[in-house]
Every structure is written in C-alpha cells, then in structure tokens.
Amino acid sequence: MSLTKSLLFTLLLSAAAVQASTRDEIERLWNPQGMATQPAQPAAGTSARTAKPAPRWFRLSNGRQVNLADWKVVLFMQGHCPYCHQFDPVLKQLAQQYGFSVFSYTLDGQGDTAFPEALPVPPDVMQTFFPNIPVATPTTFLVNVNTLEALPLLQGATDAAGFMARVDTVLQMYGGKKGAK
C-alpha cells in the first residue's frame, strides 16, 4: 500500500520535471484564470500555515456527503481525439459548477480548447494509472488528495449527467472512507 501511495504521490508531482517552465505551468494549473499567485504575508501575531481548501460538499444519491476538495479528477486526453473534444468541455463545466479540480495529462503532447495546458504524460504515470486497463482517451480517474488512492471513473465520452452519476457510484463504492459524512 505504501508503494502505491509513493507512486501516486510521485506521479502527481512528476509533472514538475517535464518542462523547463514547470513552476509557471503548475501555477496555471492551480490558477486557471492566469492570475499570478503571491505568497500571502501572515498578519502580525499569526503564524504562516498552509491553508486547507474550503470544503465543497457533494451529496451522494444515498444521502451521504463527500467533500470534493478531498478529490482531484485526473484526465488523460489527446488534442486530436474527437471524443476528448466532445467530453472535455463537459468536464470543465462540471468542475466549475461543482468546484472540483481537474489535472489534465496529454498523450500526444497537445491540449484542447477545454484544457490547453495539459501536461505531457510521463511513462511512470502511464504505468501507474494503466497497469491492467487499455489506454484510451478520454480516461478519467478520481484521486484522493489525502491518501493518493486512484479510482477509475470512465473511459470515453459521456454527458454531464452520466459523469456525475459515475462519480456518485464510485464514491459510494469507495464507501466515503475519507472526506465523507
């Protein structure tokens, strides 16, 4: 289990070694509006701590609530894939609507209009996410940001209702081990 966590942690951070302007790319991923991030200076008499994102509660169909701030959607896409061109804008709209984060990897080195800043996928990331499933685009996973556990979501395009129904099913199957109440 700790090897899996180490690999997932490494893969989420391995994007930093992909290109020379890594810091700028990471800032663009975390700040999609292109706003530069400046480190906040703590007020006098307070200590500087890393702030945890505000909870974004999502009610599952079984009545449980899950904090979407504890999850990140990892998208594998290609700039020339017609299914990605169909699905990626849907995913981007859902991310904005529900407040979850999307980390996009590209298999062909190209983004698309929804995710133009997709990072080229390193080989170790491919091996971690696709050990026993075929490589297809688009493919999405839910990654728990606290445990780095990756849960397969979908391969192929779907509509908004289909994607959120799958998120609901996967989070119920996961049992809400982390971030659910």
UniProtKB/Swiss-Prot annotation:
Residues 1-22 form the signal peptide. SUPFAM superfamilies: Thioredoxin-like (SSF52833). Residues 37-172 form the Thioredoxin domain. Its main location: periplasm. The keyword Signal applies. It is found in: Periplasm. Gene3D superfamilies: Glutaredoxin. This is Protein TrbB. The lineage of its organism: Bacteria, Pseudomonadati, Pseudomonadota, Gammaproteobacteria, Enterobacterales.
